[in-house]
C-alpha cells in the first residue's frame, strides 16, 4: 500500500509560484559551469549544497544571483527549464506558470532573446515531453529602479507572444508596489496579466497597494495578509488567489516552523490559497514535497489537499484554454487518495 506521501505525487496540481532560476540544482550548476568555463567558489556539489543553508532572504538572494553566472546560452536556459519540468511532472504538476528574472541576466550581458528563446525551447515542448502545460511570467526586480523595469519591459517587446504576464519579486521591504505603477500600467496596456510578490516580509499594506495600484490578479505569498482582518475579508470577497510557499516560508524564517503556518486558518477563513515551491532547489522541495510537508505538519485531510489543488487550476491563467482547465479540474475531482 502506498504511503500518504506517495499519494500526493500524482495528485494533479498547478504550480503558480516558481522562479526558474531557483530550480538550479547543484549538479546542474556544476555541469553548466564546466560547459561554459565558469569557476564556482565551491569545491564540489556537496559544498554548494551546504551553501544553500542560508539564514535569511538577503543571504539567499546573494547566492541566487551568484549562481546565475553559469547561465549563458539558450541551451543553458533550455536545460534548466527542462530539468524543472521533468521534476514537476514527477510530482503531479500538470500546469506551471513560470517566473523568470531578465534584469539579472541583462546585467550580465545575456540578451533577452537568449533567455526567452532558451526557456521557450523547453516550455514549448513541455506538453509533449512532460505532459505539463506552461505559461511564462516576466518578473521585475523590485530592488532595481522603475526605469530599469520599464527598459526591461521594452526589451521584451519582440517576445510578448511567449510571455503571459509580469510579476514583481526580490527584496520586498523598502520597495512598495507603488514604485512600479507606471510599469504595470504599461504592461496592462500590452494585455499582459499582472501578479506581484507582496506581504511576505512586507506589511499587509503592500498587498493592498498591489491590488489597488498595480491591478494585480494574484498575490504571490500574501502571508501577512492575515494581520489585517479587513484585508482578509476583501481577499475572500474578491476571490483573490494567494500563491503560498510553505517550505520557503520556513527557510526564510517567515514562520518559525511549518506547524506555525497559518494555512489552515487561511483556508477556514475562505481565502483562495494555493501551495507552491518558490525556489525548490534552495528551499528543499518541489510542489509535491510542499503538499506533503503541509499534510504532515498541519494535519490536512485529503479533501483539504484537493481544495488546494482545485484552487491552483482556478487561479491559473488558463482562460485562453478553458477546455484544458476543465480537464485538469476533472482530474482533481476524480483523484482518490489511498486508504490510510
Swiss-Prot record:
Keywords attached to this entry: Hydrolase, Metal-binding, Nucleotide metabolism, Zinc
Annotated NCBIfam families: aden_deam, PRK09358.1-6
The UniProt record lists the keyword Oxidoreductase: no
Cofactor names: Zn(2+)
Pfam (any one): A_deaminase
Organism phylogeny: Bacteria, Bacillati, Actinomycetota, Actinomycetes, Kitasatosporales
Catalytic activity: adenine + H2O + H(+) = hypoxanthine + NH4(+)
EC number assigned by the record: 3.5.4.2
Residue numbers marked as site, Important for catalytic activity: 221
Family: Belongs to the metallo-dependent hydrolases superfamily. Adenosine and AMP deaminases family. Adenine deaminase type 2 subfamily.
Active site positions, chain numbering: 200 (proton donor)
The keyword Hydrolase belongs to this UniProt entry's keyword annotation: yes
Residue positions binding Zn(2+): 17, 19, 197, 278
SUPFAM superfamilies: Metallo-dependent hydrolases
Enzyme class, spelled out: hydrolase
Name under which the protein is recorded: Adenine deaminase
Alphabetized GO MF terms: adenine deaminase activity; zinc ion binding
Organism from which the protein derives: Streptomyces coelicolor (strain ATCC BAA-471 / A3(2) / M145)
Role this protein plays: Catalyzes the hydrolytic deamination of adenine to hypoxanthine. Plays an important role in the purine salvage pathway and in nitrogen catabolism.
Amino acid at each position: 500500500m502506498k504511503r500518504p506521501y506517495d499519494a500526493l505525487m500524482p495528485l494533479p496540481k498547478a504550480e503558480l509560484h516558481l522562479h526558474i532560476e531557483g530550480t538550479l540544482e547543484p549538479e546542474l550548476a556544476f555541469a553548466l559551469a564546466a560547459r561554459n568555463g565558469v569557476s564556482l567558489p565551491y569545491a564540489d556539489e556537496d559544498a554548494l549544497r551546504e551553501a544553500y543553508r542560508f539564514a535569511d532572504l538577503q543571504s539567499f538572494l546573494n547566492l541566487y544571483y551568484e549562481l546565475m553566472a553559469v547561465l549563458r546560452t539558450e541551451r543553458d536556459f533550455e536545460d534548466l527549464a527542462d530539468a524543472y519540468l521533468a521534476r514537476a511532472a514527477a510530482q503531479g504538476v500538470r500546469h506551471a506558470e513560470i517566473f523568470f528574472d531578465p534584469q539579472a541576466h541583462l546585467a550580465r550581458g545575456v540578451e533577452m532573446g537568449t533567455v526567452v528563446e532558451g526557456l521557450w525551447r523547453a516550455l514549448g515542448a513541455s506538453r509533449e515531453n512532460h505532459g505539463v502545460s506552461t505559461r511564462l511570467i516576466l518578473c521585475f526586480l523590485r530592488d532595481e529602479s522603475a526605469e530599469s523595469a520599464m527598459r526591461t519591459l521594452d526589451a521584451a517587446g519582440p517576445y510578448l507572444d511567449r510571455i503571459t504576464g509580469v510579476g514583481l519579486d526580490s527584496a520586498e521591504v523598502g520597495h512598495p508596489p507603488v514604485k512600479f505603477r507606471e510599469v504595470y500600467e504599461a504592461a496592462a496596456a500590452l494585455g499582459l496579466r499582472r501578479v506581484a510578490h507582496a506581504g511576505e516580509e512586507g506589511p499587509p499594506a503592500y498587498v493592498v497597494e498591489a491590488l489597488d495600484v498595480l491591478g494585480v490578479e494574484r498575490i504571490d505569498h500574501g502571508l501577512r495578509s492575515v494581520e489585517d482582518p479587513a484585508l482578509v475579508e476583501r481577499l475572500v470577497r474578491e476571490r483573490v488567489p494567494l500563491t503560498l510557499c510553505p517550505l520557503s516560508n520556513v527557510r526564510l524564517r517567515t514562520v518559525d516552523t511549518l506547524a506555525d503556518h497559518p494555512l489552515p486558518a487561511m483556508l477556514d477563513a475562505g481565502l483562495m490559497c494555493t501551495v507552491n515551491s518558490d525556489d525548490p532547489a534552495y528551499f528543499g522541495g518541489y510542489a509535491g514535497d510542499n503538499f506533503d510537508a503541509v499534510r504532515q505538519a498541519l494535519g490536512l485531510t485529503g479533501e483539504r489537499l484537493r481544495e488546494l489543488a482545485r484552487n491552483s487550476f482556478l487561479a491559473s491563467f488558463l482562460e485562453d484554454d478553458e477546455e484544458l482547465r476543465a480537464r485538469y479540474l476533472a482530474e482533481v475531482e476524480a483523484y482518490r487518495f489511498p486508504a490510510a
